[in-house]
Amino acid sequence: MAKRKKKEVFDWEDEDQEEIIWVSKSEIKRDAEDLKQLGEKIVNLTKANLAKIPLDESLLDAIELAQRLQKEARRRQLQYIGKLFRGIDVEPIREALDKIENKHNQQQAMLHKIEKVRDELVEKGDVALTDLLNDYPNGDRQQLRNLIRSAQKELEQNKPSKAYREIYQMLKVLMLED
């Protein structure tokens, strides 16, 4: 009769065994699914946006192939891309993808900032203009000062604010070029 092997007992006092991190099978599957979804987002990007993401050559080839495939072949290719992601650090890729996805939100925030600066310029005048030109030295002080005065006069006379819109356009050019 064959002898039974004793089960290996985990020794909690042993420092080598203490450093082992136990990961459940479910957690491994969740991580793999997350990487597969990341791969799917990247596969759905345009060529111009894909060029902005730091990818190595094998991963880029796999993504370009997945863009050409359909149905089941595409699903298998996405699984393969997820597998490739497991072997590399995906944080720079996630950051680049977030920048691409949030570009619209960043532009909206910048436009709101421009509106706020314009309102401040019209309300406070030269003080706000000096602060603005400290931050953006390429601005034309004289032209901005004239537009601010015109906008203030238009507000006092309840006229349509042409200068107000011109200030906005000038600030947009000034602030978006930096």
Swiss-Prot record:
Subcellular location as annotated: Cytoplasm
Main location: cytoplasm
Keyword Nucleotide-binding: no
UniProtKB keywords: Cytoplasm, Ribosome biogenesis, RNA-binding, rRNA-binding
Gene Ontology molecular function, alphabetical: ribosome binding; rRNA binding
Pfam families tied to this protein: DarP
Keyword Cytoplasm: yes
Annotated GO CC locations: cytosol
UniProt cross-references to CDD domains, sorted A to Z: YjgA-like
UniProt xrefs under InterPro entries: DarP, DarP_sf
GO biological process, any: assembly of large subunit precursor of preribosome
Role description: Member of a network of 50S ribosomal subunit biogenesis factors which assembles along the 30S-50S interface, preventing incorrect 23S rRNA structures from forming. Promotes peptidyl transferase center (PTC) maturation.
Family: Belongs to the DarP family.
PANTHER family, per database record: UPF0307 PROTEIN YJGA
Name recorded for this polypeptide: Dual-action ribosomal maturation protein DarP
Species whose genome carries this gene: Haemophilus influenzae (strain ATCC 51907 / DSM 11121 / KW20 / Rd)
Gene that encodes the chain: darP
